[in-house]
């Protein structure tokens, strides 16, 4: 016997593959099992029983066509004697009296019969009658291989296994049920008519365990059972759902690129149809070649004495019936293949629309898919459309964002966020969130927060809950794309005062920020296009009715004309141009009310003429430009309110004498230039409180320095001073005196008259001793005295102790 288990390897496959087997494939599979059983049964009979039985024909014949075996059909079956064959003549019209019958003697032994049987089986029996069961087995195995080839082929099986694995996890995920129930609940509030249809589908009645209805509806029951626990999703389940979203994205990107699965399925179906047609034709033609009586002619006279035989094919009757049965099964199998082809070509299987799922669930952003991804979903629908519905949840960005939000809320509770609160230099209580996948809802429970900084937070969505942050004044968006809902924008529009936006791409600038009418400070940091027409972010500032401070750190070639939209209330305007030459500054003339102007790293070679028309200007900062001369400084006398002038980090070689015209100057910063001489006219600016001339090439300090009776800060470090005039110590209000990195050999004892001195820097000079009069500087402490330790030890003990006192 041939054990059927030997054929198990040809039909064995993973049970999970059943979701990709529509009804016609299942029917075809069972038909192949039936055909395989027919073939195996025939092969078993062929191997275990006699194939053919032959008897000699006493009439000699040279060829097979001359052998007449028709009398065997008319005679009764043979007797039990194997060597004798008794023939009974047919009855005649006139009955003759009974007579004794005698058989024919063939004078052949058993070996001769076996030899003749084998010779006639090989030469006289038609090949179809001999190999019919083997052909059935072979053809059936080919059908089985064709039907399951795409489950085994490496290029397709990997995708199928991956898809089935993801599909099962998506179906069983608690997040699937929760997302469907939440969205359906929201949809029911907006669309009562949809509520009834969704409830009828999802809210099936609970059947008792073991009831027949439970067995009939396993998937619906499972959905209902999960709905009861859908409201609770722990952290582990949330992480698993998050991983599923990533897997679905990668799988979709990988599978939608080609149509290998569709092509393989179609080719194997076409191959099955072609094979079906071929097998049907030749079987229908040759089934008549199976005969019960077979004439045989072999040249065996020398061995047996006979050359013609009449043979009986013992299994002919059974094989003919099996062949007809096989053809019937084959016909049904062929019909399933033809229907498969009809299904393949009738419908657009390379496109799959979730329109019905979107309408039913209310999740409106589920995308349609194509190519192989669409094809496998069509197959899944033939098994159970509920799989596609639950799988669609993991294609929705809305669903993913809700899950991300839920995971964020688990990871960042309000107490944990409060631990991250810090004070900014301005004294505000700030919460800094860095590299989060979103904005946790728990942020809006920290009501004491005054400043919120979001750095590299992906897709931050500011919900209406922001209205709970009643103390929120400042918002910082650093490489972060932030979106706001309408209610959120209405609140921010009236409450947000300070906004900072740092971006690498201009698309990261949210356009809603230009509608914040209560905004007082706007700081933009990032690269903008040189063509301002391509900068939609700066198209209009007209809505910023309260803007007082505007800072742009970018690479502008000219000042945006839209700055004029806020000219009526702008008080401070700053441009940090990062080394890009600022060519056009005509727009500055419109900023008549500006009090502070900063043009940093703009590659300016002279003081811009547009500045001189700013009559309300109080602070001018031209840091890190390429100024070589400042002869135009005389025109600054038109800026009558100018009190702070910062020309630091430039290449200025001298100070023009007409600087004396700037009578209102209170701060002058000329540090890090190339100044050699300080003109005495500078000290006619007798309102100076802050004078910084550090890191220049100054060798002498004019005695007129004593005129500056209001001076509180004097920076002369990093020069070539060898001596200090005694008049310097007439500046009784000096609080900070920086003399480090010079060539001073001593410090005048008159330094003791500087009773307000808080900070004194002397490190890097050529002094041997310090005057004991430092003890008279009652405001000076050791922490404010910057000097070498060895030089400090030259002071008397009592002076040192006094300086060390708190």
UniProtKB/Swiss-Prot annotation:
Placement of LRR repeats on the sequence: 544-566, 569-589, 593-614, 616-637, 641-662, 664-685, 687-708, 710-731, 733-754, 756-777
Keyword Membrane recorded: yes
Compartmental location: Cell membrane; Endoplasmic reticulum membrane; Lysosome membrane
PROSITE patterns assigned: LRR
Residue intervals on the Extracellular side: 44-130, 297-323
Cellular component, GO, one term: endoplasmic reticulum membrane
Membrane topology, Cytoplasmic segments: 1-22, 152-275, 345-806
Membrane topology: Multi-pass membrane protein
Superkingdom in the source lineage: Eukaryota
Residues bearing attached sugar chains per UniProt: 57, 80, 312
Keyword Membrane part of the UniProt annotation: yes
Biased composition annotated in UniProt, kind: Basic and acidic residues: 188-207
Quaternary structure, from the entry: Heterohexamer; oligomerizes with other LRRC8 proteins (lrrc8a, lrrc8c, lrrc8d and/or lrrc8b) to form a heterohexamer. Detected in a channel complex that contains lrrc8a, lrrc8c and lrrc8e. In vivo, the subunit composition may depend primarily on expression levels, and heterooligomeric channels containing various proportions of the different LRRC8 proteins may coexist.
Full protein name: Volume-regulated anion channel subunit LRRC8E
The gene coding this protein: lrrc8e
């Amino acid at each position: 016997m041939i054990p059927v288990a030997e054929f198990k390897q040809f039909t064995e496959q993973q049970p999970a593959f059943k979701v990709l087997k529509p009804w016609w494939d299942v029917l075809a599979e069972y038909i192949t099992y039936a055909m395989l059983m027919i073939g195996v049964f025939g092969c078993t009979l062929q191997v275990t029983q006699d194939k053919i039985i032959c008897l000699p024909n006493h009439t000699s014949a040279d060829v097979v066509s001359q052998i007449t075996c028709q009398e065997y059909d008319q005679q009764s079956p043979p007797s039990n004697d194997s060597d004798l064959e008794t023939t009974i003549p047919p009855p005649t019209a006139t009955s003759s009296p009974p007579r004794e019958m005698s058989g024919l003697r063939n004078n052949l032994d058993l070996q001769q019969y076996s030899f003749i049987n084998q010779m006639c089986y090989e030469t006289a029996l038609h090949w179809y009658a001999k190999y019919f069961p083997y052909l059935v087995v072979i053809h059936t195995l080919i059908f089985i291989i064709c039907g399951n080839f795409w489950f085994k082929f490496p290029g397709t099986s990997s995708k199928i296994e991956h898809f089935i694995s993801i599909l099962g996890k998506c179906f069983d995920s608690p997040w699937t049920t929760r997302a469907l129930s939440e969205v359906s609940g929201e949809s029911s509030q907006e669309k009562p008519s949809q509520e009834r249809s969704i409830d009828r589908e999802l809210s099936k009645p609970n059947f008792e365990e073991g009831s027949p209805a439970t067995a009939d509806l396993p998937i619906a029951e499972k959905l209902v059972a999960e709905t009861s626990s859908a409201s609770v999703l722990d952290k582990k389940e949330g992480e698993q759902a998050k991983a599923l979203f990533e897997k679905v994205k990668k799988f979709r990107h990988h599978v939608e690129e080609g149509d290998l699965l569709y092509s393989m399925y179609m080719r194997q179906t076409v191959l099955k149809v072609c094979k079906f047609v071929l097998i049907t034709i030749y079987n229908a033609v040759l089934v008549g070649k199976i005969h019960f009586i077979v004439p045989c002619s072999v040249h065996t006279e020398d061995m047996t004495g006979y050359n013609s035989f009449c043979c009986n094919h013992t299994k002919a009757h059974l094989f003919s019936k099996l062949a007809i049965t096989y053809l019937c099964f084959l016909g049904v199998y062929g019909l399933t293949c033809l229907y498969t082809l009809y299904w393949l070509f009738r419908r657009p299987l390379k496109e799959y629309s979730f329109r019905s799922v979107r309408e039913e669930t209310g999740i409106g952003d589920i995308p349609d898919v194509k190519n192989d991804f669409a094809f496998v979903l069509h197959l899944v629908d033939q098994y159970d459309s509920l799989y596609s519905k639950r799988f669609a949840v993991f294609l929705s960005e809305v669903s993913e964002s809700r899950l991300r939000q839920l995971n964020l809320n688990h990871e960042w509770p309000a107490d944990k966020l409060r631990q991250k609160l810090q004070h900014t230099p301005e004294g505000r209580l700030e919460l800094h969130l860095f590299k989060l996948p979103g904005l946790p809802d728990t942020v809006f429970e920290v009501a004491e927060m005054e400043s919120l900084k979001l750095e590299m937070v992906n897709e931050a969505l500011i919900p209406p809950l922001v209205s709970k942050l009643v103390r929120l004044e400042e918002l910082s968006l650093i490489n972060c794309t932030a979106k706001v809902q309408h209610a959120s924008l209405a609140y921010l529009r009236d409450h947000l005062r300070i906004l900072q936006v740092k971006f690498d791409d201009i698309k990261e600038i949210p356009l809603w920020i230009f509608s914040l009418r209560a905004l007082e400070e706007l700081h933009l940091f990032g690269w903008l296009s040189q063509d301002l027409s391509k900068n939609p972010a700066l198209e209009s500032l007209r809505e910023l009715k309260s803007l007082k401070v505007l800072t742009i750190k970018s690479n502008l070639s000219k000042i945006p004309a839209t700055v004029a939209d806020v000219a009526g209330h702008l008080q401070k305007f700053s441009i940090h141009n990062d080394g890009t030459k600022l060519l056009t500054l005509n727009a500055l003339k419109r900023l008549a009310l500006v009090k502070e102007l900063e043009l940093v790293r703009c590659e300016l070679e002279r003081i811009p003429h547009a500045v001189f028309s700013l009559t309300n200007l109080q602070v001018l900062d031209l840091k890190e430009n390429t100024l070589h001369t400042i002869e135009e400084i005389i025109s600054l006398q038109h800026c009558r309110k100018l009190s702070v002038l910062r020309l630091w980090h430039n290449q200025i070689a001298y100070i023009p004498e007409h600087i004396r015209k700037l009578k209102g100057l209170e701060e002058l910063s000329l540090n890090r230039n190339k100044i050699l001489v300080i003109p005495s006219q500078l000290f006619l600016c007798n309102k100076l409180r802050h004078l910084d001339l550090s890191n220049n090439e100054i060798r002498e300090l004019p005695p007129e320095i004593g005129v500056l009776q209001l001076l509180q800060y004097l920076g002369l470090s990093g020069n070539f001073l060898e001596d200090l005039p005694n008049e310097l110590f007439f500046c009784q209000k000096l609080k900070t005196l920086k003399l480090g990195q010079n060539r001073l050999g001593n410090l005048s004892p008159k330094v003791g008259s500087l009773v307000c001195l808080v900070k004194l820097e002397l490190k890097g000079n050529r002094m041997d001793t310090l005057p004991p009069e430092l003890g008279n500087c009652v405001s000076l402490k050791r922490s404010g005295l910057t000097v070498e330790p060895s030089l400090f030890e030259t002071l008397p003990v009592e002076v040192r102790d006094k300086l060390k006192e708190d």
